[in-house]
Regions:
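Mobile cap/lid helix-loop segments that gate and shape the active-site cleft of serine hydrolases
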Residues: 4-10, 133, 137-141, 145, ...
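Short amphipathic alpha-helix adjacent to the substrate-entry channel of hydrolases
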Residues: 59-77
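Conserved alpha/beta-hydrolase "acid-adjacent" motif
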Residues: 225-234
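Short beta-strand/loop motif that positions the catalytic acidic residue
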Residues: 212, 218-220, 224
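Short beta-strand element of the alpha/beta-hydrolase
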Residues: 41-51
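Alpha/beta-hydrolase active-site loop
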Residues: 86-107
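N-terminal cap/lid segment of alpha/beta-hydrolase-fold proteins
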Residues: 1-39
Length: 310
């Protein structure tokens, strides 16, 4: 049966949890599975929490995860290694493994792994941008998936909310504002300190590195003084200039964490992500139909991004 997605649909949910791997500290990294109850198969979304690389877990984005899953998306939110346990690139290694793990497990929850995309919030947005841009980087692919060793971490699309697209600019802003905890969070994660430049999506584009550019959604609060709009808009412009497709949505009157509270702008964020995903899945179906018409195997795109490398 073909996977379809109607962003206006309504489904009941079954929510379960499963361990997906262990952090170097020994902490169980859990995955929370939001499984629509219905015919399926359903498109698949991996969700990555924020927390300045030092805090939070898979429950941080519950309101968004539930809203998306109730529209007919298999949403799986995962814990990530925190900086006090291990610095960069440990959490991005989790993400890379998590993408491959979810591709391998999606059918267990009535999901279609060929549709996989990801959602990242704040530092989770940074981590998924890094993983999506460098899906096959040996630095990030260190955790082997014995059950499916040939799977890779490529994605069809990425949606973000307040992503830390330039962690060095965010650090300088925190230093200027006297936010000692935020400054220390950056130092905890980027250790040694020069890794803040290697693991920096904006600087990667500035250096002209050869990276994968999947369709990207960036949602940004107008009043965000944590990740400033001007910094985000520079990244969006750089992503487009490098050949990537990027939808940028500014949310008037909103700060960094606006989606945590119910309201019209939170509802708008939910709908923006749904419509973005619907467009990407439609594009994927069209690409598959064109491959079939040419006599090619449309299943090949199971691990290929919708966009090409740039």
């Amino acid at each position: 049966m073909k996977t379809t997605y109607d962003p206006t649909a309504k489904f009941d949910l079954k929510v379960t949890e499963v361990e997906y791997r262990r952090a170097v500290s020994g902490r169980m990294l859990m995955a929370r599975v939001y499984q629509p109850q219905g015919g399926g198969p359903f498109p698949v979304l991996l969700d990555l929490h924020g927390g300045a690389w030092n805090n939070q877990d898979r429950t941080a984005n519950t309101m968004m995860d539930e809203a998306l899953a109730k529209s007919g998306i298999l949403v799986v939110a995962i814990d990530l290694t925190r900086a006090p346990e291990a610095p960069y690139p440990a959490s991005i290694q989790d993400v890379n493994y998590g993408v491959r793990w979810l591709k391998q497990r999606a059918r267990d929850w009535n999901g279609d792994p060929t549709t996989i995309g990801a959602l990242g919030s704040s530092s989770g947005g940074h981590e998924i941008e890094m993983c999506a841009m460098r899906p096959e980087d040996p630095y990030y692919c260190v955790h082997k998936l014995a059950e499916a060793p040939d799977l890779d971490a490529t994605l069809n699309y990425v949606a973000t909310r307040s992503p830390v697209s330039d962690p060095y600019a965010r650090y300088l802003n925190a230093e200027k504002l006297g936010r000692a905890e935020m400054v220390q969070n950056s130092k905890n994660y980027f250790n040694p300190w020069d890794t803040i430049h290697d693991g920096n999506p904006q600087e990667i584009l500035d250096r002209g590195e050869k990276v994968t550019l999947v369709p990207l959604l960036v949602m940004q609060g107008e009043l965000d003084d944590n990740v400033r709009p001007a910094v985000q808009e520079k990244f969006v412009a750089s992503y487009r200039a490098a050949g990537g497709e990027c939808q940028y949505e500014l949310f008037a009157g909103c700060e960094h964490l606006w989606v945590r509270e119910p309201g019209p702008q939170t509802d708008r964020a939910h709908e923006t992500v749904k419509q973005f995903i619907a467009r990407q899945l439609k594009a994927k179906r069209l690409a598959g139909d064109q491959q079939s018409a040419r006599g090619e195997d449309p299943r090949r795109i199971a691990t290929d991004p919708l966009d090409h490398e740039s």
